[in-house]
Structure formats: C-alpha cells, structure tokens
C-alpha cells in the first residue's frame, strides 16, 4: 500500500487541505474535524484503498482503516498537512465546538461514565458469578453450589463483597470523573463522593424503609432540619453536586488571593457544596433518579413485548445518533437498585441489536460477490457478535441499507421475545455473545434463545433481500 497516496486521496476527498481543522487517530480510525462537511466526497472515500467504513459523529468525520494501517495513513496525512501529532482528546475538543446542545450533553455524559465502566463491569460480572453460585437449581435441582460445597462459602461471600464495592462507592467514582469533566479538582470531587457515602450516615439503600419506620436522624443547622442519609448507589445527586463543586471552585480561584488559594478555595468549595448536597441537590436528585429507574422499569414490565419490540427496533438508529451513551447512566442507576429493579433490561436488548447487526453483516458477506466487501464484512460481523458493532454498521450495513433494515427487524422481534420473558442483566459487559455471564441466571436460557432468533432473522432477511437486490440489478 502507498500510504502517501492514500493520505493525499483522503485529503482531496475531504475537501482539500484548507477544509481540515484537526486530525488524529485511535486504534482503528482517522478522526478528522472539517470546516464544511458538504465538501466531503463520501463515495470517493469509500473507494480509497484500505477504507473499511466512514461516519460522522460528535463533530468529527471518522474513517475506518483498521489497526496496523491507520497509524501509517495518519503519519503520511500529518506530513502532508504539515501538522504535528494531535491527541484524540484535542480533536474531540475541536469537534465539540461544532456540536449542538444535545450532542454536547450526550458527549458530556459519555466522558463522565466511560472512564468508570471497567469498575462497573468488574463488579457486575462478579455479581453475576455470585448469583450463579448462590442460585438454587441453576446447576443442581433445589440446591446451589454453596450447598454442595460449604467450604467455598467464605470465598463466595468475598466475591460478593468485591462485587458490591463499585456500586456502594459509586458516588466516589462519579465524583472524581464528573468533577474532572466539569473542570474542577477531581480529588475534591472524590472527597465529595466520600461525603455522600460516609459511614456515619444512615444507609441510603434502605432509605424508604428507614423513613417509613421514622428512624431518620437529622442535623439541625442554620434552622434547617437536614436528613443524615447517605447516597449509596445514586447517580444524579453526585453529578449535579460535582458540577456545583467545579463551578464554585473555578469562581473562587478568580477572587481568592493566590497565597490563600490552596487553603480557602477547597475549604469553601467543599463545605458549600456539601451543605447544598444534603439540603437541596441530594433529596431532589434521589427522587429524580428513583423516578427515572422506576418509570423505565414500569414501562418495560407493563408494555412487555410491545415495549421490547419498539426499543429493540430503534436501538441501532439510536446508536447512530450517539444517544445510546446516555443509557450508561440509566443502566448504572438500575443496577445500583438491583434489589428493587431486578437489573437492567437495556443490556439484553442492546445485545439483541448487536447480534442482529453482526448476523446481517455476515449475511451480506454470504450473498455479495465483491471480494473487497466480503473481506470487510466477515471480520466486522464477527466483531459485532462479540459486542463491537461499529465496523459492521458503518462499514457494511448502513452502506447497503438492506442489511441494516434486516438487523432492525431481527432485533425488534428478538427483543419482544426476551421482554415477554422479562430477561434482565445484573451486570454490564460486552453486549453480545460475551454478555452471557452478565445475565440473571433464571433468564439465561431465554437470552440465548433471543440471540438465536435475532441472528437467524437478520441473516435470513439479509440473504433474501440481497438476492432480490442482485436480481433487480441484473
């Protein structure tokens, strides 16, 4: 491959050197900010050697080359553009300037939640392992693994302790991540999160029960009666409080003399935010988060297969808009209240959609004669089955439309089936074949049935529609 030639073609098809504001690359994609997207020749980019897909998102135009190739194309591109190496965060910042309010909101939530996902995934998967080990009848009728092997009881309890940690101390993780995103000191954000789950406070998990029994303790400060209750497992209170903390900190630094800054600024920022957190932000945020999770769970449980069908059908188009990033916050809230919600229904539906996109992509590979397209479709389809849908969706399915439509239909029908049987996940993970450990043990069989339905329908429809398209072309 002539990478200099490929890079020059990319520049030309993007509207020329003067139309490019910033450029970087990640593991598989060129990430470019252009001044005018109307100048982009999408058909021309599609025909450039090595290009596996393209799409616009978050103010950036991204071209998929794949690992091992993208870095070489970028090296040639940056040389031709006369720019130094840029980080993806720098390009993202440049792209953000072009985004609307809704896009910035979605990106903001993603920037906060994506860094903490490994902790949530680890805790969630361990929670799934704990559930499998303690579920009666999962391996042996009327008994669980601990009943069969009492010697591992402490190990199982230890697994449960680790599994719960990210959710119990979720405000600490979110406080750090959100305050950093809002431009404040992340360690002050972590301290704020610690305050919200301080052991001296009543357990936030049992707030409703404690309130019903009349056992709530109070602080009496400035004539206010403030509940001494923690915010374990909550999302909204710490997000809002982190924004207040960062805003206060930045404004205080403007007026506090530099020699007093390290003393006065953190003191007043944390004290004022803490007071607001327990008097206004926390109580309102707790109710808002509870209403959101309760409302979504009620809709899923009430609408049943109809709600599942609608959500499953629309999930892939939602992914295209980037709005699916907001689901991380909702899922985190649902999992944090798993005893009440039973888990998250979003993850299984996302898995049905991903499986459908992967199967449709493989169906396209089966029916198409173009060797280049097949070379892209096979690995992309396998990737989607494993939970990474980007290459399949943008590289093949959307490009030819009928695989994408077939996948939407497969996802809708399979999501209706799993919704009918109330399939839920008790952990996050890769939404696809690797997501099996995340599913509630009593839902595992129907989850597998759902994946089979999703893949079968998407693959079959893609082959039928593909052959029909070929006949029309002839």
From Swiss-Prot:
GO-annotated molecular function: kinase activity; protein-N(PI)-phosphohistidine-sucrose phosphotransferase system transporter activity; protein-phosphocysteine-trehalose phosphotransferase system transporter activity
Q: Where in the cell is it found?
A: Cell inner membrane
Highest taxon above the source species:
Bacteria
* Record gene name: scrA
Which ranges carry the PTS EIIB type-1 domain?
4-87
Regarding the membrane, this protein is recorded as: Multi-pass membrane protein
Q: What is this protein called?
A: PTS system sucrose-specific EIIBC component
Task: Describe its function.
Answer: The phosphoenolpyruvate-dependent sugar phosphotransferase system (sugar PTS), a major carbohydrate active transport system, catalyzes the phosphorylation of incoming sugar substrates concomitantly with their translocation across the cell membrane. This system is involved in sucrose transport.
- What residue ranges are annotated as transmembrane? 109-129, 158-178, 182-202, 229-249, 264-284, 303-323, 345-365, 376-396, 403-423, 444-464
Q: Which Gene3D superfamilies does this chain map to?
A: Glucose permease domain IIB
**Do you know which Pfam families this protein is assigned to?**
PTS_EIIB, PTS_EIIC
CDD domains in UniProt:
PTS_IIB_glc (cd00212)
Species the sequence originates in:
Pasteurella multocida (strain Pm70)
Q: Where is the active site?
A: 26 (phosphocysteine intermediate)
Q: Name one GO biological process term.
A: phosphoenolpyruvate-dependent sugar phosphotransferase system
Any one GO CC term of this protein is:
plasma membrane
Q: Which UniProt keywords apply?
A: Cell inner membrane, Cell membrane, Kinase, Membrane, Phosphotransferase system, Sugar transport, Transferase, Transmembrane, Transmembrane helix, Transport
Q: Which reaction does it catalyse?
A: N(pros)-phospho-L-histidyl-[protein](out) + sucrose = sucrose 6(G)-phosphate(in) + L-histidyl-[protein]
List, alphabetically, the PANTHER family matched: PHOSPHOTRANSFERASE SYSTEM TRANSPORT PROTEIN (PTHR30175), PTS SYSTEM TREHALOSE-SPECIFIC EIIBC COMPONENT (PTHR30175:SF4)
Q: What is its EC number?
A: 2.7.1.211
* Domain PTS EIIC type-1: start-end pairs: 107-474
Q: Which NCBIfam families match?
A: EIIB_glc, PTS-II-BC-sucr
Q: What is known of its domains?
A: The PTS EIIB type-1 domain is phosphorylated by phospho-EIIA on a cysteinyl residue. Then, it transfers the phosphoryl group to the sugar substrate concomitantly with the sugar uptake processed by the PTS EIIC type-1 domain.
